[in-house]
């Protein structure tokens, strides 16, 4: 994901937590905040120290970013997304991470094939 597609600032995370809606499963919590006039989705990641050491936390973040990259064409582009990884996420493979994120995105009604028409920047 490109730098402009990342949520980094504390106030941006806070805005998504306060104004956005949330959906969860055993592995992840997904917060979604629709934003008018935004043409690219933005992603913020949070993995607590309780989940594991730095190597484990960074692995989870890499897997989540890769899953979002694959699903980007099916996601609403006018939203900010924040993913919080829970403890069970540390033992998942990439396929399981992707499947779990797809599940929580479908629950949040942000994953749909109709958003797949937009072009990706390479």
From Swiss-Prot:
Xref: InterPro entries: Ribosomal_Su5_D2-typ_SF, Ribsml_uS5_D2-typ_fold_subgr, RNase_P, RNase_P_CS
Family of the protein in this entry: Belongs to the RnpA family.
UniProt entry tagged with the keyword Zinc-finger: no
Protein name (record): Ribonuclease P protein component
Gene Ontology terms describing biological process: tRNA 5'-leader removal
Keywords: Endonuclease, Hydrolase, Nuclease, RNA-binding, tRNA processing
Summary of subunit composition and partner proteins: Consists of a catalytic RNA component (M1 or rnpB) and a protein subunit.
Entries under Pfam families matching the protein: Ribonuclease_P
Organism: Shouchella clausii (strain KSM-K16)
NCBIfam families found in the cross-reference section: rnpA (TIGR00188)
Catalysed reaction, written as an equation: Endonucleolytic cleavage of RNA, removing 5'-extranucleotides from tRNA precursor
One function term, GO molecular function aspect: 3'-tRNA processing endoribonuclease activity
Gene this chain is encoded by: rnpA
Functional description taken from the UniProt entry: RNaseP catalyzes the removal of the 5'-leader sequence from pre-tRNA to produce the mature 5'-terminus. It can also cleave other RNA substrates such as 4.5S RNA. The protein component plays an auxiliary but essential role in vivo by binding to the 5'-leader sequence and broadening the substrate specificity of the ribozyme.
Enzyme class: hydrolase
Family matches, as PROSITE patterns: RIBONUCLEASE_P
Domain of life: Bacteria
EC number: 3.1.26.5
Entry GO terms, CC: ribonuclease P complex
């Amino acid at each position: 994901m490109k730098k402009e597609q990342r949520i980094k600032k504390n106030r941006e995370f806070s805005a998504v937590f306060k104004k956005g809606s949330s959906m969860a499963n055993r592995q992840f919590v997904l917060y979604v905040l629709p934003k008018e006039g935004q043409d690219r989705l933005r992603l913020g990641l949070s993995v607590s120290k309780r989940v594991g050491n730095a190597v484990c936390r960074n692995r989870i973040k890499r897997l989540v970013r890769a899953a979002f990259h694959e699903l980007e064409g099916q996601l609403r582009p006018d939203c900010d997304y924040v993913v919080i990884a829970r403890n069970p996420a540390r033992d998942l493979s990439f396929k399981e991470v992707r499947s779990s994120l797809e599940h929580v995105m479908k629950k949040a009604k942000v994953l749909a094939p109709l958003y797949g028409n937009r072009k990706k920047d390479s």
